[in-house]
């Protein structure tokens, strides 16, 4: 039997095409709670973040302003209307959650759309662009660099750079938790959703090893 209608969605990164979001969100239809595990998520495509965020709001939402040397359009989330998810949302983050992952987590806090639990995020959100170069004549050597071109300012007027997102509930796994593969963060998220599962059992739901080898894929786990 399904336990409480909770869907856990582990998202290793936002480096997937925005068109794939539709199929992922459809899995959440009919569930009363969606737990988004963004722990270890380094970020990804801005267009994917914008499309993804739009599924959680009934109206278009400004995600953040971009502050650069020249005027820039803000990051916007266009509401997906009836195709969106209207249930409870719980977001898990840690010190390795960066860029798009922490921007999304902070957006959910500011709009009072979800609860964020875990550890303070990385505080690495500045937007950058890649620049490529070639050197040499007979033997061409290609190299490149990323140049920061804008800071990201949230709706409260603050940047997350160097500060990160402070969770609504700070829960940091201990060394013993990690050694024994317990997950007190996911356990607490499930408790908020109305399901009591101890950290040891929660640690078996989303094993860390499962996602180290599949960082380019989005994994979905339904609690049964």
Placement of each model-derived feature along the sequence:
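Conserved functional hotspot residues or short segments at active or partner-binding sites
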Residues: 126, 161-163, 176-180, 184-224
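C-terminal structured "cap/appendage" subdomains that terminate the fold
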Residues: 130-132, 137-162, 166-167
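Short acidic (Asp/Glu) and glycine-rich catalytic loops that position anionic groups and cofactors
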Residues: 31-33, 164-171
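Flexible glycine/proline-enriched surface loops and loop-helix/loop-strand junctions
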Residues: 86-88, 170-174
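Residues in well-ordered beta-strands of folded domains
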Residues: 10, 64, 117, 146-153, ...
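A broadly conserved detector of short glycine/acidic/proline-rich loop/turn motifs that flank catalytic sites
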Residues: 12-13, 95-96, 120-121, 149-151, ...
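Cleft-lining beta-strand/loop regions that shape enzyme active-site pockets
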Residues: 1-138
